[in-house]
């Protein structure tokens, strides 16, 4: 059999383990076959090793079918066995192998609650994450930081997550402030630092230190306003956005005295970011302003902002933006968000959103809750619904009470099959197409009449 074809042949059984040193010289598949191999090289890792852990580096392998995956495709023991193999692979010599292992563990933890399993191995995982953050390059650092966020979400507040933050915090801070590091890695580390601090820290000094670190990053965008009326985006803009959003998240758990102090410092400077030529920066600045106004009015119902007229004019312009030089998708996204921001600033109103997960519903009725939900949704992806059902920490954050216990039979009756989803989506698509066709016909008739 040709060499390349042999490598593409799928392995039978579960994933095998791999590592460095003596462990790297022998690999075994779950089918029971053993063979001698040489230590991994970066070139081999992308082909041979990925065949062992590709199922765990693909988000869809854990997240697509939700919490019922194990009932249908394996047992808890199978998953834990495979995760042990992935944890071993985080020590591999190949950077690609380590990255794939980190991503695989992250995807598993994002789609399942594995508290007991993680609790026993938290120090091993923390050491692996620290090593990958220190010695890895851009993609590996991003994967390690993303795993650190999910690890803290699994552990929840307590001594264990405090130990994780104590170990990883200085490393994350160093990467965030390192101008020579990859922008993508710094961006993910900024989000991770904010989330881990939100979950784990009980030390007010540490909270203020994290706020200051993030503040030092995004406030660099303020400096450009002196040179021009429009803030031009730079490669660092994405980092500034992540730092601003993480800073805003942490502000929601600060004492009122610190919130008041930060309000006085930033409420007059943040509007300058609304003139950025990056749509994501404009949206992040607008949502942060709305949240700051909400916090300010929570402290003082008669909160007064001197430049209210100028601010509302700017928000109204963004809510009705018709600039032909901007992409249609960006304009549509921006107008939708800034309509809500304008209502929040002018009328103190928030359009309530409903999030459904299983038999439960959660109402997002304020900017603080929206910022919190959006942050964890970004990290957990499609696993957010499962964690809202099962993760006690998230249920406490969103005041959902203890997890609702449902037996397997009840869950099965509630689950919609893929075929039923397909039929529903097809009918909705057909109805939407007909409605839009009628609108297009009317516009065409009007054009011909005139």
From Swiss-Prot:
Q: Does the keyword Lipid biosynthesis apply?
A: no
Q: Name one Pfam family in it.
A: IFRD_C
Enumerate the InterPro entries for this protein.
Answer: ARM-like, ARM-type_fold, IFRD, Interferon-rel_develop_reg_C, Interferon-rel_develop_reg_N
Give the Basic residues compositional bias ranges.
1-10
Cited SUPFAM superfamilies: ARM repeat (SSF48371)
Q: Which UniProt keywords apply?
A: Developmental protein, Differentiation
Q: Where is this region: Disordered?
A: 1-46
Q: Give a GO biological-process term.
A: cell differentiation
Where is composition skewed (Low complexity) in this entry? 22-32
Q: What is the protein's known function? A: Could play a role in regulating gene activity in the proliferative and/or differentiative pathways induced by NGF. May be an autocrine factor that attenuates or amplifies the initial ligand-induced signal.
Family membership: Belongs to the IFRD family.
Quaternary assembly: Interacts with PSIP1/LEDGF.
What's the protein here called? Interferon-related developmental regulator 1
Name its species: Sus scrofa
């Amino acid at each position: 059999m040709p060499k390349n074809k042999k490598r593409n042949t799928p392995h039978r059984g579960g994933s095998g383990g791999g590592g460095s040193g003596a462990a790297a010289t022998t690999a075994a598949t779950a089918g029971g076959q053993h063979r001698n191999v040489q230590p991994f090289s970066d070139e081999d890792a992308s082909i041979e090793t990925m065949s062992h852990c590709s199922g765990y580096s693909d988000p869809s392998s854990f997240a697509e079918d939700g919490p019922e995956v194990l009932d249908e495709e394996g047992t808890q023991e199978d998953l834990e066995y495979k995760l042990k193999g992935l944890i071993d692979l985080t020590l591999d010599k190949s950077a690609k192998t380590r990255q794939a292992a980190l991503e695989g563990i992250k995807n598993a933890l994002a789609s399942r609650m594995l508290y007991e399993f993680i609790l026993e191995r938290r120090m091993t995982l923390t050491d692996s994450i620290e090593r990958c953050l220190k010695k890895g390059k851009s993609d590996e650092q991003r994967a390690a930081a993303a795993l650190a966020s999910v690890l803290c979400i699994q552990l929840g507040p307590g001594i264990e997550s405090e130990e994780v933050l104590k170990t990883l915090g200085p490393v994350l801070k160093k990467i965030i402030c390192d101008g020579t590091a990859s922008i993508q890695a710094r961006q993910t580390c900024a989000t991770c630092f904010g989330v881990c601090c939100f979950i784990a820290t009980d030390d007010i000094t540490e909270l203020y230190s994290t706020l200051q670190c993030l503040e030092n990053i995004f406030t660099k965008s303020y400096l450009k306003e002196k040179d021009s009326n429009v803030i031009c985006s730079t490669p660092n803009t994405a980092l500034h956005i992540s730092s601003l959003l993480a800073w805003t998240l942490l502000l929601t758990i600060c004492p009122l005295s610190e919130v008041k102090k930060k309000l006085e410092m930033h409420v007059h400077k943040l509007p300058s970011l609304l003139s950025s030529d990056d749509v994501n920066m404009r949206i992040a600045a607008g949502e942060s302003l709305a949240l700051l106004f909400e916090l300010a009015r929570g402290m003082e119902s008669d909160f007064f902002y001197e430049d209210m007229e100028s601010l509302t004019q700017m928000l109204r312009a963004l809510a009705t933006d018709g600039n032909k030089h901007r992409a249609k998708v960006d304009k549509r996204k921006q107008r939708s968000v800034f309509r809500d921001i304008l209502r929040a600033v002018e009328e103190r109103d928030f359009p309530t959103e409903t999030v459904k997960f299983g038999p439960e519903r959660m109402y997002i009725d304020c900017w603080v809750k929206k910022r919190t939900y959006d942050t964890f949704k970004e990290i957990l992806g499609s696993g957010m619904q499962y964690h809202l059902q099962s993760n006690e920490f998230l249920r406490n954050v969103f005041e959902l009470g203890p997890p609702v216990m449902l037996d397997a039979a009840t869950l099965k009756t509630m689950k919609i099959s893929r075929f039923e989803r397909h039929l529903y989506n097809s009918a909705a698509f057909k109805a939407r197409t007909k409605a839009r066709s009628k609108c297009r016909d009317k516009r065409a008739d009007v054009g011909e009449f005139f």
